[in-house]
Structures are given as structure tokens and as C-alpha cells.
Regions:
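Short alpha-helical elements
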Residues: 1-167
Length: 167
């Protein structure tokens, strides 16, 4: 039986708390008192992440932005760009971090796919020692699930070279 209790905090307030965290980059426990308690905000964040709402929201925003920026433009891009970025992370709280020997960074690596207007289409985060081809393939798999029907060219640097990724 579904839970029909009335919410104590509005979803808008929870989203505002998540936007605050994103903008300021602070710890969950340091949320100001104007927002709900951090365990509740974190609960909704993880719940929406698990059911794919963040990805669906991003996809809808990209399509809407492309339509409103230039009405003659299609919802789906034709060209995308794939690249990796190594980022440092804290010593605690991250299980799958590694060392990127090339950039000498201990942390994680994010593979980002953006369109030519720099709008995020797909992302994959893995340990820093993960090969670009492995992370790129995971990011491309996420991109394929989004159904950008016109996308036919993804540009990438030499780190993504090789036959397995091209297929």
C-alpha cells in the first residue's frame, strides 16, 4: 500500500538544498538550517539517482535548451565530443579511486560527452587509473541509452583510439 502521508518538506526545498550543495561544494552535514536535515536531502538524491531521474532531467533540459536556443535546430545533436578529466578526491568516502600516472593525480576520472554547444549529454565517473577506452565505452553506453537519434559522430582524442571503442 503506498504511503499517503503529507510531506513535511516540499520537494522544491529539497531541490534547492541540492542546488546549494552543487553550487557551494560543501559537505552534506554543512547544509544551512533553512533546508531539511541532510539525511533527508541525501535520501532523495540517492533515490532519484537510482531511478534515473537526474539523467532524464538532464536529457529533457538539453532537448529543451536546444529547441529554445534556435527553434530551427533539432532536439538531437549530430556531433558530440568525448574527453576525460582527472579530479582529486578526499582520502575518505571514495571506494574506487586510483592514481592517474600520466597526470600524477590520485582520485577519480570523469568521462564527459558534450554536444558542440557544451551541453552535457552523458558522463561516467571511475577510478583515475581507468583506461580512457574503458571509461569512454561506459560513457558511450549511457549515451546510446538516451536515444539521440541524429547523433552520428563522436569526436575524441587519441587516448580513445583502438578498435574496441570504434565499434
Amino acid at each position: 500500500m503506498p504511503d499517503t502521508r503529507r510531506r513535511k518538506h516540499s520537494l522544491r526545498l529539497i531541490i534547492n538544498a541540492l542546488l546549494y550543495l552543487t553550487k557551494n561544494g560543501c559537505q552534506w552535514r554543512l547544509l544551512p538550517r533553512e533546508f531539511p536535515a541532510f539525511p533527508l536531502v541525501y535520501y532523495y538524491f540517492r533515490r532519484w539517482q537510482a531511478d534515473g531521474r537526474w539523467a532524464a532531467l538532464n536529457q529533457a533540459l538539453v532537448r529543451r535548451h536546444r529547441q529554445h536556443a534556435a527553434p530551427s535546430r533539432q532536439h538531437s545533436p549530430r556531433v558530440a565530443v568525448l574527453d576525460a578529466q582527472s579530479i582529486k578526491c578526499s582520502e575518505r568516502g571514495v571506494l574506487d579511486k586510483g592514481v592517474d600516472g600520466h597526470k600524477k593525480i590520485q582520485g577519480r576520472q570523469r568521462q564527459l560527452i558534450v554536444d558542440t554547444g557544451r551541453l552535457l549529454l552523458a558522463a561516467h565517473v571511475g577510478p583515475a587509473h581507468e583506461n580512457d577506452r574503458v571509461g569512454g565505452k561506459a560513457a558511450l553506453t549511457k549515451l546510446a541509452q538516451q536515444g539521440f537519434e541524429r547523433l552520428h559522430l563522436v569526436l575524441a582524442d587519441a587516448g580513445y583510439g583502438g578498435q574496441p571503442l570504434v565499434q
